[in-house]
Amino acid sequence: MEKYILSIDQGTTSSRAILFNQKGEIAGVAQREFKQYFPQSGWVEHDANEIWTSVLAVMTEVINENDVRADQIAGIGITNQRETTVVWDKHTGRPIYHAIVWQSRQTQSICSELKQQGYEQTFRDKTGLLLDPYFAGTKVKWILDNVEGAREKAENGDLLFGTIDTWLVWKLSGKAAHITDYSNASRTLMFNIHDLEWDDELLELLTVPKNMLPEVKASSEVYGKTIDYHFYGQEVPIAGVAGDQQAALFGQACFERGDVKNTYGTGGFMLMNTGDKAVKSESGLLTTIAYGIDGKVNYALEGSIFVSGSAIQWLRDGLRMINSAPQSESYATRVDSTEGVYVVPAFVGLGTPYWDSEARGAIFGLTRGTEKEHFIRATLESLCYQTRDVMEAMSKDSGIDVQSLRVDGGAVKNNFIMQFQADIVNTSVERPEIQETTALGAAFLAGLAVGFWESKDDIAKNWKLEEKFDPKMDEGEREKLYRGWKKAVEATQVFKTE
């Protein structure tokens, strides 16, 4: 009887369940979208119960649609949108407020106040993160401060906090396991990534009671089992958890120090495995935990690009220059260059290494001869320039020269982007056969814990290259183009609207 690992990939707009066989191949996929809530400008929320319902639905669907029985599932792995915060009543199991999503800016004033009080460096040193609304800690404080009776309940030990992984494990296990893993804990602003413990000083600054917090576990171990009524009468081990970007790093088999992956999703996320050393960044990168296995933690440097694949959506939906995302490639390759046009897609500011939230998008170098093809090509090239910005910051901070870049996400199907990426970073770009690397990473973590795979070496053999893009551009051309990009970014930062 063939066995499978069931991977739950709980994302920002949809929940997915993917079955993987022993070769790491996909044996079935189910997906369901859920509602986004925008109660005020800049606020983004989800209903945690709707997320839970969507996860139950896709788990059921992937098993039913693929003629798989529940007793063929060897283990369950979970990967999740990181930082999104749920606070719920531990007796009723009901969330006391919507889940506050990672994108939501509603805790800006809390962050500003803590900065004014001089605590920014304290958070940076202990957590490796910036004091920003992006991360979970200030979201928990906001819920306790703004939901009537919440703080009193929390002090009495009646409330639980969790990121989405914690919420799902708690629900799946029938309230038996209130846990998170090192990778998700490291995104909360409350976890000391050096001591590997919840930090009392940070909790005091955020006024969050410690009794709400989940137990922090390895990214690969059996946390509990599915309660029989949620899973066809079967008690299946829940055995792997990692935040989405860290799961993608693991799914790309980036197990060695200096291994790098870049995800081209709506935004872009680059992670470098820095081994057992938490590298302090001087270049606007985050220091984070990649994963914890067998009592050992691996750290990572992370760079965030706010606009990546969404720039292509903008060409399609906003400007109506293309009818479909794949069309952008054929337009871009009709011309040999952009003729000096640069697009800086700072629609919501600039991420790593600039961290300029006030910047807005700009276009430079237009002439009467500029055509649609030049504009589209310049937009695609912007994804690659931003990636080089992050990669240079990583090399500088870590002292490691990147030997190859493993890639995933929607935009990697675009061969023009992949080749230009290799050219502009002067490094080989490796596109894997299985691009569902986030779900695959969660499956690998769960599979290791239940003996489905023996070791990381065993897993690395499952990683298969679809295509390798080697740099073809000469040095002079590459550096000239990149100098132009740096000038364009500089000019973008000068222009600020009132």
Curated annotation (Swiss-Prot):
Q: What is its EC number?
A: 2.7.1.30
Sites binding ATP sit at 12-14, 266, 309, 313, 410
Q: Which gene encodes it?
A: glpK
- Residues spanning the signal sequence: none
Q: How does it assemble?
A: Homotetramer and homodimer (in equilibrium).
- Similarity comment text for this entry: Belongs to the FGGY kinase family.
List the protein's name: Glycerol kinase
Q: Which residues bind sn-glycerol 3-phosphate?
A: 12, 82-83, 134, 244
